[in-house]
Regions:
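PLP-dependent aminotransferase class I/II
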Residues: 11-16, 110-194
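PLP-dependent aminotransferase-like
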Residues: 1-54
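Conserved PLP-binding catalytic core of the aspartate aminotransferase-like
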Residues: 176-177, 185-218
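Short beta-strands and strand-loop turn motifs
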Residues: 25-28, 51-58, 84-88, 195-196
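Accessory recognition modules or surfaces
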Residues: 146-147, 159, 203-217, 233-241
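Active-site pre-lysine segment of PLP-dependent enzymes
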Residues: 18, 35-48, 60-84, 88-120
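PLP-dependent enzyme catalytic core of the Aspartate aminotransferase-like
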Residues: 68, 216-217, 226-257
């Protein structure tokens, strides 16, 4: 089996695929296009492709692929007999997540959508996620291949409780929408290249020594040098509260001076 991934993207796709014995083929996104997924990625899907992964928005770039392009990618997968896996685990941070979701394309038996409670609701340790798919035969195979009792009763209870936290989710979405441009513009004011992301994180380019300089000051940035398609000059930072974002910008100004 062969799977096609954009690069850079979430590293665990490749790790899981290789563990299952799949061959991983990467389509390297262009830096000059801010690592956006374009029609070139669709053209990379061929008859030898069994599965395609798309992170929406992409991790670590934060780039959001337009739904029309996702639909075109799905049609290409259908024509080639491939499955399209769309990871929407970070999409819920966007106020318009339902409009941007690929759910409206679920009539296709070639589409799988991955979702998670752990990101938006800040409970990663619960390990609670799910998939959406209209292909019953495929779902049966997935269930047969999975572990019995894969979701604990505590995780189920946490997930049900999270669904009632609509006010909390709205506050988080509002915070991200408000603070993302503030943090982005602040980073750019320091002379850093920052991608126009749509997620609750931003990817920016800085001296490779930046991470080591910040650590003694109590700030840890995600170095993205281990992502295929990126080097050690790329960093990802979360969009946090206004005081935390300002503290980051203040410290960066001191370190980069």
């Amino acid at each position: 089996r062969t799977a096609l991934l954009p690069a850079p993207t979430f590293a665990e796709y490749a790790a899981a695929l290789e563990t299952a014995g799949c061959t991983v083929r990467r389509h390297f996104l262009r830096e000059i296009e801010d690592f956006a997924v374009t029609e070139a990625f669709i053209s990379a899907v061929d008859e030898d492709t069994d599965m395609v992964f798309l992170c929406q928005p992409n991790n670590p770039t934060g780039q959001l692929t337009p739904l029309a392009l996702v639909e075109a990618l799905l049609h290409r997968c259908e024509a080639c007999g491939a499955l399209l896996v769309v990871d929407e685990c970070f999409l819920d941070f966007l106020p318009q997540s339902e409009v941007l979701s690929a759910k409206k394309l679920l009539a296709s038996p070639n589409l799988i959508i991955l979702k998670a409670f752990t990101k938006l609701y800040g409970m990663a340790g619960v390990r609670l996620g799910y998939c959406l798919c209209s292909n019953i035969a495929l779902l049966d195979k997935m269930q047969a291949a999975g572990q019995p009792w894969a979701v604990s009763s505590l995780a189920q209870a946490a997930g049900l409780a999270a669904l009632d936290e609509t006010a909390y989710a709205a506050r988080v979405q509002e915070l991200i929408a408000e603070q993302r441009p503030v943090l982005r513009d602040g980073l750019r004011a320091l002379g850093l290249r920052v991608l126009d992301g749509s997620a609750n994180y931003l990817l920016f380019q800085a001296p490779e020594t930046l991470g080591d300089a910040l650590r003694p000051r109590g700030i840890v940035l995600r170095s993205c040098g281990n992502y295929p398609g990126l080097d050690g000059s790329w960093y990802r930072t979360a969009v946090r509260t206004a005081p935390e974002n300002q503290q980051l910008l203040k410290t960066l100004q001191e370190v980069l001076a």
